[in-house]
Amino acid sequence: MQPPSFSTSEDTVQPVSAASPIASDDASSAFVVAVPARYASTRLPGKPLQLIGDRPMIQHVADRALAAGAREVWVATDDARIAEAIQGLAGVRVAMTSSVHLSGTDRLAECARIAGWDAATCVVNLQGDEPFAPAAGIRAVAQVLQRSGAEMATLAAPVDSAHDLFDPNVVKLVRNAHGDALYFSRAPIPWHRDSFAGQRDAVPAGNHWLRHIGIYAYRAGFLQQFAAMPPGTLERIESLEQLRVLEAGYRIAVALTPEQFPPGIDTPEDLQRAQAQLASA
């Protein structure tokens, strides 16, 4: 295996259907994947290096990006231990970024500058705690961006339980008729006045409730704009960074994921479930 590269910083398209998911076997243009990874995690310290099977989590995430067919895969980190964990993983590069970034978006913007991507490059932001992210989903979010003409793209899935609908840790969203996001919220949106007045132990009929999947795509040029924008009022209230984009008047295209994304890993209990899932595979 070849060691990774280590770097430091010194035309109109058709709109995406709002009703249908992106087909997983559609041809797509080239895209790159960047994985923000930091060692400090309040609920699961050293999360990227936690073992799933006999390999650290960050290696599993990088594998998913490679399986999706990304032209380049980069891990953006400020921690030498995470960089070392990528050594020997063919096809993956490391961007050593600043330790003062306040968000993964800031870290990815620096990674894009280190990588030297031109403004039109399609960049997929794959979270570092998604070791089982489906390759079809990673490709799909790139396709959404490329076809929609929006500044940013993401994925969603139907809400299938009342628990998730009312759980503030499960982010919900609503779209317009063209498939663009109208709003993201920790609240159950849209609020079904009649159904919720009587009971809140089931998801009302109608397939109107979507939960957000935290994978994004943007052009490298817009990524720099996004990182430079000041936080918006709605972003501060909901603690959802993507609201900065909507509040500034930009589009976020949303499509249904072609394949289910397993939950990310945030806690020791999540890690145990991931280890059990791999063992049973």
From Swiss-Prot:
Biological pathway: Nucleotide-sugar biosynthesis; CMP-3-deoxy-D-manno-octulosonate biosynthesis; CMP-3-deoxy-D-manno-octulosonate from 3-deoxy-D-manno-octulosonate and CTP: step 1/1; Bacterial outer membrane biogenesis; lipopolysaccharide biosynthesis
UniProt-listed CDD domains: CMP-KDO-Synthetase
GO cellular component: cytosol
Entry superkingdom: Bacteria
EC number: 2.7.7.38
GO biological process, one term: CMP-keto-3-deoxy-D-manno-octulosonic acid biosynthetic process
GO molecular function terms noted in the UniProt entry: 3-deoxy-manno-octulosonate cytidylyltransferase activity
InterPro entries, A to Z: Cytidylyl_trans, KdsB, Nucleotide-diphossugar_trans
Cross-referenced Gene3D superfamilies: Spore Coat Polysaccharide Biosynthesis Protein SpsA, Chain A
Cellular location(s): Cytoplasm
UniProt KW keywords: Cytoplasm, Lipopolysaccharide biosynthesis, Nucleotidyltransferase, Transferase
Catalysed reactions listed for this entry: 3-deoxy-alpha-D-manno-oct-2-ulosonate + CTP = CMP-3-deoxy-beta-D-manno-octulosonate + diphosphate
NCBIfam families attached to this UniProt entry: kdsB (TIGR00466), PRK05450.1-5 (NF003952), PRK13368.1 (NF009905)
Described function: Activates KDO (a required 8-carbon sugar) for incorporation into bacterial lipopolysaccharide in Gram-negative bacteria.
Family: Belongs to the KdsB family.
HAMAP family the UniProt entry points to: KdsB (MF_00057)
Official protein name in the record: 3-deoxy-manno-octulosonate cytidylyltransferase
